[in-house]
Amino acid sequence: MKRRRNKKQGWRWLIAFVILFALASGIPGKASSTTTTSSPSAQTLVAKVNSLVENLSYRSRSSSTSGSSTMVTPSKQKAEAVLTANVKQQLGSSITWNGDGAFIINNNKAKLNAKINNAPYAVDRLDSQGRAWQGDAWLNKTTRQYKNRSETGNGATSWRPVGFMQLTNLKNGPTHAYDRGHLLGYALVGGLSGFNASESNPKNIATQTAWANEARSTDSTGQNYYEGLVRKALDRGKQVRYRVTDIYDGNNLVPSGAHIEAKSKDGSLQFNVFVPNVQNNITINYATGKATATN
């Protein structure tokens, strides 16, 4: 416990140092008015500090919840178990294992139009059976959210999506089975006025395994890994078309996985992947959501 507390304090000091350094770098000295134009504006400086603090804070939080020691990458056999004929038909003919938990779809080329000039938007849709189905968005830096959920009134609630039959005290991987899995991530759309980015939006939340939701390393590519690519692009001022479609097999309550596509307007970012809704230490009855430990 003491070691964990010291680690948290270390992160706080590091974040404080970053803020002080950024502020010091952005304050012009005794230079003429012609040189101050090259100094970062207050707005730009604040944005950079927010980005740095958000990234550092996220790493601190993730060290105890989604570290490499618990985010065990599912095997290819485990991941392929959800690729039924029906699921494959929805994804298309080009489905390739990436070796790190997910599948590359259509040679990683997204079927999205990013050459648009609309204001940022985000829409969430239910399917014909009332299940969380698709989130579609046009994102830029203004849609980013750097504050935590409690600060914006989007904290945890007792609401649960269908099929959310939690299983805890698991071993050899994440200690719990399920998260409230978002389609459009809070950090990506939480700054967009009018969009419900809470954890109780039935159009944007489905039952998702802890691994599929949280895994974020290059050798364990859950949804959070791909969201991280989009976050970084937005922080660099890119405009990104982004779409997440939950893929269901028949009438199942729990999705087989998330089909995630992204494409920036300038073409610097593009991916088309399927993150299977699996976890190495459980088996799932997707029709009901009942999970069984396989320790």
Describe each PLM feature range.
Residues 8-32:
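Sec-dependent N-terminal signal peptides of Gram-positive bacterial secreted proteins and lipoproteins
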Residues 116, 127-295:
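Domain-level detector of nuclease and nuclease-like folds
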Residues 13, 69-85, 157, 221, ...:
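Membrane-embedded alpha-helical bundles that constitute the cytochrome b-like, heme-associated redox core
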Residues 31-110:
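N-terminal, intrinsically disordered, polar/charged segments of Gram-positive cell-envelope systems
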Residues 108-109, 114-123, 163:
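N-terminal post-signal-peptidase region of extra-cytosolic proteins
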Residues 26-36, 260-263:
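Hydrophobic single-pass membrane-insertion segments
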